[in-house]
Amino acid sequence: MDDHKPIDTPDGPAVDTPGIGAHRYEAPPTDRPITEAEAARAAGLAHNEHLKIASRYLRGGLADGLLKHATGAISEDDGQLVKFHGMYMQDDRDIRAERTKKKLEKAFSFMIRLRIAGGVVTPKQWLILDNIATTYAGNALRATTRQTFQYHGVIKSNLKRTMAAIDSALLDTIAACGDVNRNVMAATNPAQAGAHKAALQLAKDISDTLLPKTGAWREIWLDGERVVGGEDEAEVEPVYGKTYLPRKFKTVVAVPPSNEVDIFAHDLGFIAILDKKNRVTGWNVTVGGGMGMTHGETDTFPRTADVLGFVKPEDALKAAEAVMTVQRDWGNRKNRKNARLKYTIERFGLDAFRAEVEKRIGKKLEAPKPFTFENNGDRYGWVEGEDGRHHLTLYVPSGRIKDIDGGPQFLSGLRRIAEVHEGDFRLTGNQNVIIANVPAAKRAEIDALVDEYGLTRGASAIRRNSIACVALPTCGLALAESERYLPDLLTELEESLARHGLQDEPITIRSTGCPNGCARPFISEIGLVGRGPERYHLYLGAAFDGSRLSKLYREDVLASEIKDTLDPLFAAYAKDRQPGEHFGDFVIRAGFVAKTSNGPDFHERTGPLRAA
């Protein structure tokens, strides 16, 4: 698609400003042609828009900033651009005050996120990633909620070495963050080998098709040759243009009956429609999901995705590009808090959005096909696939792959397994690891290593269905603890649930240190969202399969009071639930909390409707 063609929006005709998208503006009174950055400023667009325009396809001052050895940081503007390269600049907030008192610079480091479509890596790649963790990243890998790895604590002087090592594994970090299509997730259900293969291939195809084409990543991090002339034909972004997308864009591929990728929480999704032999006949397309919001600003809200229509396999890539480019052209580039696709659809309506997608695909979407999701969790332990291969899902608390004193030796154990494993590894959207494609003859050897290193095949029902974001001390947005707090809370809740005979009842619980929603707390039956030190908003009433948003139940609950707040609800659930009724459905039916229909309704009728 031609990113330099003016495209009309439902608001009216667009001005032909290459790369800026369909935003009207008044040119300043001058005889000379205005620059693109001036046009962006004149349009009142967000700072990031003219930052992208002036970046020379995401180069900015990054190369020069890496040479400034007197600081562990990069400039604020380059801190925005480096996200497109898969990194966030962070500092250790545990020691921030101490360093400030001593008049020292913050303890800066970088979080590096990989692009691994579908979350599949080979044993050889695992060993390289393990070596990076032990050499540059504090002896830890972190499996994320979006099916990839993150490294934390990489200092600036080690960035290029780390990137070179990642490249040696035939992996990269391009577009793992930033205003682009990010890492594409795919279903990992190993029991459906054929459907998983189709889902994984679609995820890879979307990732490759929607990948930025700039050579900046290889040039800056691997000392690759710069494209002669800077902006010749090879440097034109054929899909994105110079301003890329208004905001992040997340894509997933799901295979019913499992919704472990949380398809309704993402901008774009594809739901596999299967025949009786588990073969993919096409895909339902979902659009407009997203978790992030801002405390106290009701024009920001989480939203579950709508089902847009059905496409045949040969049209799936066209649909992906069409949806993303409509968001490119219609999305809000003036206010980043309202820039995600969910707000675009709320603003223009699903029918208008569908019509534009169909126009770009060149055909009508078919009506959605029936589908059913049963849960959004993982299947733990061994599972045999249709092809006779075996797959072992391990429970990894908060996705933190490290050796724990007196506990599981995740880093060492998985390294040892990678040395003998003949299949592959798969990450799940619930931060767990699957040792996949194990021949039957190798199961005993894998089992022995799992036992030797104390790796966990499962845990309590509520712990198995828990997710936490990183939060403190590295995330600059965190208002409260999450990963370091949730395990202790789960121990308290396990005691409470056991007292009411609910210890085997699966209940989803997720915690985030801020309302950006990285752990997708607004579609968990119990959601904790940080408000301040040891204070959380408590959300209840989401669907067990991730298809319905929760509702705010209590504001600013102290961490010490969360167990006592939930205990009466557990007691009522144990006493009055119907057969097969999940906790999130029960608290709505029993009248403890209102049901959220979607989007703007999230902020309506909040609080407990009656005492527990």
UniProtKB/Swiss-Prot annotation:
EC number per UniProt: 1.8.1.2
InterPro entries in the record: CysI, NiRdtase/SiRdtase_haem-b_fer, Nit/Sulf_reduc_fer-like_dom_sf, NO2/SO3_Rdtase_4Fe4S_dom, NO2/SO3_Rdtase_4Fe4S_prot, NO2/SO3_Rdtase_4Fe4S_sf, NO2/SO3_Rdtase_FeS/sirohaem_BS
Keyword Metal-binding: yes
Region (Disordered): 1-32
Keywords of this entry: 4Fe-4S, Amino-acid biosynthesis, Cysteine biosynthesis, Heme, Iron, Iron-sulfur, Metal-binding, NADP, Oxidoreductase
Binding residue positions for [4Fe-4S] cluster: 469, 475, 514, 518
Entry note: cofactor: Binds 1 siroheme per subunit.
Gene Ontology terms for molecular function: 4 iron, 4 sulfur cluster binding; heme binding; metal ion binding; NADP binding; sulfite reductase (ferredoxin) activity; sulfite reductase (NADPH) activity
Matching PROSITE patterns: NIR_SIR (PS00365)
Family: Belongs to the nitrite and sulfite reductase 4Fe-4S domain family.
Subunit structure: Alpha(8)-beta(8). The alpha component is a flavoprotein, the beta component is a hemoprotein.
PANTHER family: SULFITE REDUCTASE [NADPH] SUBUNIT BETA, SULFITE REDUCTASE [NADPH] SUBUNIT BETA-RELATED
Function: Component of the sulfite reductase complex that catalyzes the 6-electron reduction of sulfite to sulfide. This is one of several activities required for the biosynthesis of L-cysteine from sulfate.
Name of the protein described by the UniProt record: Sulfite reductase [NADPH] hemoprotein beta-component
Lineage: Bacteria, Pseudomonadati, Pseudomonadota, Alphaproteobacteria, Hyphomicrobiales
Gene name of the encoded protein: cysI
